[in-house]
Regions:
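A short, N-terminal "cap"/entry segment at the start of jelly-roll beta-barrel domains
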Residues: 1-34
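Double-stranded beta-helix
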Residues: 6-12, 99-134
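A generic "binding-loop/recognition-motif" signal
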Residues: 20, 54, 88, 96-97, ...
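Short beta-strand His + acidic residue motifs that chelate non-heme Fe in jelly-roll/DSBH
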Residues: 24, 49, 68-69, 92, ...
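Conserved short histidine dyad/triad with adjacent acidic residue
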Residues: 37-55
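His/acidic/aromatic-lined binding-pocket segments of jelly-roll/cupin-type domains
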Residues: 50, 56-61, 82, 90, ...
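Glycine- and acidic-residue-biased ligand/ion/polar-headgroup-sensing regions
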Residues: 54-67, 71-72
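Short acidic-glycine-tyrosine-enriched beta hairpin
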Residues: 73-94
Length: 134
């Protein structure tokens, strides 16, 4: 799992442009994103508790806070979590179990994927696990 804030950690080849109208920041440039989904979650909701064998998944919170739990698939250690806030973008590589918990009233986020993950293929690279939320 990697995490960065899109407004604070702008690195080449990504760019940010700011003027009197506001700001535009690149989230991806020249990447192989094959699916994008916008998700809304209510307070107390749990999502995930799964991993992907081939898909790399990126999650960007646009509103609210997410408690993001993760651990490598072949690791018996206890899972860890990070708080993901508005503007944070995190990357989940293949074979990393992940789950999401929503402590605030309302959270919105966008999921970008490299690999099959949407429409009729939504579950084709999703492998469910027991809960990793402690």
């Amino acid at each position: 799992m990697k995490i960065k804030n899109i407004w604070k950690d702008v690195q080449e080849p990504l760019e940010m442009h700011t003027d009197n109208r506001g700001s535009i920041v690149d989230i991806f440039y020249n990447d192989n994103i094959q699916h994008v989904a916008y998700i809304k979650s209510n307070k107390g909701a749990l999502r995930g508790n799964h991993y992907h064998k081939e898909t790399t998944q990126y999650v960007m919170v646009t509103k609210g806070v997410m408690k993001y739990w993760y651990k490598p698939l072949d690791n018996s250690d206890i899972s860890r979590f990070v708080l993901v806030r508005s503007g944070d973008l995190l990357e989940t590589p293949p074979n990393e179990i992940h789950a999401m918990e929503f402590p605030e009233e309302y959270t919105e986020f966008i999921v970008f994927t490299e690999g099959t993950r949407g429409g009729k293929d939504y579950e084709s690279d999703t492998f469910r696990t027991e809960s990793i939320i402690c």
